[in-house]
Swiss-Prot record:
InterPro entries: HotDog_dom_sf, THEM6_lcsJ_thioesterase. Keywords: Transferase. Thioesterase; part of the gene cluster that mediates the biosynthesis of oxaleimides, cytotoxic compounds containing an unusual disubstituted succinimide moiety. The first step of the pathway is provided by the HR-PKS poxF that serves in a new mode of collaborative biosynthesis with the PKS-NRPS poxE, by providing the olefin containing amino acid substrate via the synthesis of an ACP-bound dec-4-enoate. Induction: Expression is positively regulated by the oxaleimides biosynthesis cluster-specific transcription factor poxB. Pathway: Secondary metabolite biosynthesis. Its EC number is 2.3.1.-. The keyword Acetylation does not apply. This is Thioesterase poxG. SUPFAM superfamilies: Thioesterase/thiol ester dehydrase-isomerase. PANTHER family: PROTEIN THEM6, PTHR12475. It is an enzyme of class 2 (transferase). The gene is poxG.
């Protein structure tokens, strides 16, 4: 047990160090409080996430048998703060930094939910499908993302990112992400039993959200695009059968295939607005019709 005299001695030494090297102390404090933005830290966080799900927890696979059909829509949650280097001139988290946070959160979701994409040994048996018809090694590639900002995140404020599968169509799988206050999910769960009015629940949910984002992914087997529904069935996350499956880690609220499809259709209605943004690519053809107002480099007109 540390004695009081030792703590006092340690405090005096620390104070002396601060007084002797004030600028070095400030530098260390700033670095430690912004370690999230240190060089190569983004890469390290990404590699750690992939290693954890692909090596350390390789056999912890999400399947219908373990989590039920609702497991496909399960959330991945990551937590973070907004350090000094992420703040803009307005004094809150810069808009551009949301995307680097999303990268880390989504890599957790992809490597947790779609482990069977790149590893055939983690996929369930499909006796009714010929081996040559099954995708060999699928890649999950990012196709686009978009953020809708609602409220600012203050410097060093804590927040969580909740992401899940929203829907899918013939080519793309859509993921929705929410930047929310810590503990929002638990609060919503407790309020659901207390608040009966759906409009009131919607208002409460909206008040907890800082930012919402939507992302689309495509499954690739070599250069061939794999339909999301086929990819999900291949990984044991989607079943065409209405048969109720015995599950080990989900609650008693068992989902049918019809309910999954209903949830997909609800999500695709929202995703349609994101899909429409692909038409923006065609608008560049009119570039010659409008004047150029200036061209600038990294440091204005100098470079």
């Amino acid at each position: 047990m540390v004695s009081l005299s030792c703590l006092i001695s340690y405090g005096e030494c620390l104070l002396e160090t601060v007084q002797t090297h004030p600028w070095s102390t400030i530098g260390v404090v700033v670095f430690l409080s912004s370690v999230k933005n240190a060089p190569l830290m983004w890469h390290a966080r990404l590699i750690i996430a992939v290693f954890y799900h692909s090596v350390t927890r390789k056999n912890d696979v999400v399947t219908i048998e373990r989590y039920g059909r609702q497991g496909l829509f399960g959330y991945i949650v990551t937590s973070s703060r907004s350090p000094l280097y992420e703040c803009d001139i307005n004094g809150h988290k810069s808009d551009s930094t949301y995307f680097s946070d999303l990268d880390i959160n989504r890599i957790h979701l992809i490597t947790r939910l779609f482990k069977g994409a790149g590893d055939l040994s983690l996929r369930p048996d499909r006796p009714n499908v010929a081996p040559e018809d099954r995708p060999k090694k699928m890649r999950v590639l990012l196709g686009g993302t978009c953020c809708s900002f609602r409220r600012e995140i203050k410097p060093y404020a804590a927040y969580e990112i909740h992401s899940r599968v929203l829907a899918w169509d013939e080519k793309w799988l859509y993921v929705v992400s929410y930047f929310v206050k810590p503990g929002s999910a638990r609060k919503m769960a407790s309020l659901q039993t207390e608040v009966g009015d759906k409009c009131e629940m919607t208002d409460l949910a909206r008040s907890m959200v800082f930012t919402s984002a939507i992302t689309k992914f495509v499954f690739k087997d070599g250069r061939k695009t794999v339909r999301p529904a086929d990819a999900l069935e291949e990984m044991g996350l989607l079943s065409a059968s209405e048969e109720v499956v015995e599950i080990s880690e989900a609650g008693e609220d068992l989902w049918t295939r019809s309910r999954v499809e209903e949830r997909r259709k609800t999500g695709i209605k929202i995703a349609q607005h994101f899909i429409a943004l692909d038409e923006l690519h065609d608008q560049f053809e009119h570039v010659s019709e409008h004047p150029f107002l200036g061209k600038f480099g990294v440091l204005g007109t100098m470079f």
